[in-house]
Every structure is written in structure tokens, then in C-alpha cells.
């Protein structure tokens, strides 16, 4: 089902996007890191958890059994489409979806025990402001954990596509590489410390995943879901084919028995309020 994403999400304003395609493009990888994010935020029984940029609700889904029936998990996202998807996936679970800008959260100070943000912070126009909001809504002693993508070469499923597209669309280079904008662990650490967090740690974390085939990898890109595939749809048909073939050539080194297997590195930053 296609829905319209609101402005500010890493999809073009007013563009119809299939949330399930987004899950196939990014979700299959992001969920590999969610257990480490929840552990860094010490999500546990009776906890009040805020999942910022909840997307299709994967982090919230994994947090719910950790907090139990006496806890609560709120999922905030600026995208109506993503909230619709998350609400449908988690209906009846105790999940509370809220339409919200991560840079201006509609919650009282000290409302939560833990705040997590999985692959959302790098798309904030002002990520430092967002981290400041995370600190504001956390109680004293509460925990934050954010996960962002490392450098393009350490996230080849996204990095190669962004690099190839940037040669065809040089005017969009900044947009294409926005996914990697918080790749510097020192910058992420400084941001957390600057927001008032203590015991800050930023750890490089790697997971390996796979696609059944190159076609399995490529199919969500054709839907234009996410900041990088959106740009792909701007190209003429001949250029799209050229991009596809070059990306396929680059990723061939990850192919084994027809499947694409590759590692992705992300940074997990955490701290105590």
C-alpha cells in the first residue's frame, strides 16, 4: 500500500511511497543492529521508552517484550506513512504511535526512561537540536542510544549506489551522501556530550546480511524509497540502466552462489542523562 510522506522525512514531500519497500531496502539491515541499540539504552522491565524515527516500528516491536505489560513504548515519526505501517504491524501490542518532529518532541521534560533512535538522526536538519530534545525528555539517569550509518565504504549496499549516482547527478551529491553525514564517531560523541549526556560511548558495530540475488537488492530501489533511491528515479531510462549495471558490477565481489552477502558498519552512540 502506498501512502504520502510528510515533509522532513527522507522521502520527497508529497511523494507516494510504499513503506513495505522501505522495510525491504533498509529495514532488513537496520533490524540487525536493534538489539545492540536497546541494550545500550538499557531497555528493561516497566520502562518508558521513546523510539524516535520509529519508521515501520521494528525497534519498538523488539522493545515491547523487554518492557513487559507494565512498560510503555512510544513510537514517534514525522512521516504519516511510516506511522500507519507501524500502527498496523503493532496493533493491540501496547505500542503508542505519535506524529512528531524529532527536533521538537511533544512530550514533557523527564517523561521517559530510555530514548532510542535507529537510523533517523542523520536525516535531521539539525541533529544536535534533536539530541538536545532526547536529553530533555529523559529522566535523570535515563539512557539514550542512537544508531547511524558509518562511512560509504563500510556500508557498501548504500555507498556504492550513492557513489555511482553522484556521477550522474552531481548537483545532488550532498543529498545522496546524507545517509553517511554522521559517520564521524568524534562528532557523534561531541553531540551527545554537548547535549548534557554523561558516560558517553560511541562504538563501531558490524553485522553481516544477505540478499537472495542482485534482483532482490535492486527491486526496492526501483520504488524510489529512501533518500538515495529517490534520486535514482530522476534519471532517464538509459541512465537508470547504466547505473544498475555499474552497481551490479561493483557488488559482484560480494556474490556467492547467487546471493549477495556483505557487512555493514554502524555507529552506536549512547549516554546517561
Q: Which residues does each predicted region cover?
A:
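Conserved alpha-helix/loop element of class I SAM-dependent methyltransferases that forms part
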Residues: 28-47, 62
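A short SAM/SAH-binding and catalytic strip from SAM-dependent methyltransferases
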Residues: 113-127, 150
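Conserved catalytic/acceptor-binding region of the Class I
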Residues: 128-129, 135, 139-212
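Class I SAM-dependent methyltransferase SAM/SAH-binding core
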Residues: 48-105, 114, 129
Amino acid at each position: 500500500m502506498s501512502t504520502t510522506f510528510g515533509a522532513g522525512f527522507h522521502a520527497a514531500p508529497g511523494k507516494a511511497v510504499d513503506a513495505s519497500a522501505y522495510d525491504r531496502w533498509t529495514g532488513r539491515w537496520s533490524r540487525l543492529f536493534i538489539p545492540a541499540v536497546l541494550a545500550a539504552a538499557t531497555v528493561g522491565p516497566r520502562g518508558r521508552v521513546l523510539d524516535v524515527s520509529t519508521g515501520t516500528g521494528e525497534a519498538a516491536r523488539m522493545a515491547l517484550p523487554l518492557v513487559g505489560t507494565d512498560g510503555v513504548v512510544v513510537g514517534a515519526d514525522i512521516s504519516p506513512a511510516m506511522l500507519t505501517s507501524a500502527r498496523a504491524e503493532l496493533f493491540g501490542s501496547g505500542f503508542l504511535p505519535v506524529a512528531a518532529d524529532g527536533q521538537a518532541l511533544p512530550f514533557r521534560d523527564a517523561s521517559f526512561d530510555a530514548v532510542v533512535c535507529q537510523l533517523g538522526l542523520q536525516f535531521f536538519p539539525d541533529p544536535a537540536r534533536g539530541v538536545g530534545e532526547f536529553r530533555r525528555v529523559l529522566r535523570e539517569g535515563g539512557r539514550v542510544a542512537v544508531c547511524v550509518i558509518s562511512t560509504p565504504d563500510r556500508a557498501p549496499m548504500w555507498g556504492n549506489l550513492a557513489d555511482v549516482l553522484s556521477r550522474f547527478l552531481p548537483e545532488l551529491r550532498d543529498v545522496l551522501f546524507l545517509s553517511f553525514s554522521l559517520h564521524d564517531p568524534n562528532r557523534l560523541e561531541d553531540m551527545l556530550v554537548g547535549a548534557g549526556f554523561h558516560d558517553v560511548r560511541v562504538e563501531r558495530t558490524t553485522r553481516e546480511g544477505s540478499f537472495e540475488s542482485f534482483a532482490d537488492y535492486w527491486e526496492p530501489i526501483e520504488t524510489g524509497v529512501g533518500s538515495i533511491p529517490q534520486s535514482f528515479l530522476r534519471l532517464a531510462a538509459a541512465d537508470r540502466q547504466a547505473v544498475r549495471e555499474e552497481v551490479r558490477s561493483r557488488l559482484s565481489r560480494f556474490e556467492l552462489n547467487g546471493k549477495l552477502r556483505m557487512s555493514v558498519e554502524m555507529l552506536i552512540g549512547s549516554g546517561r542523562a
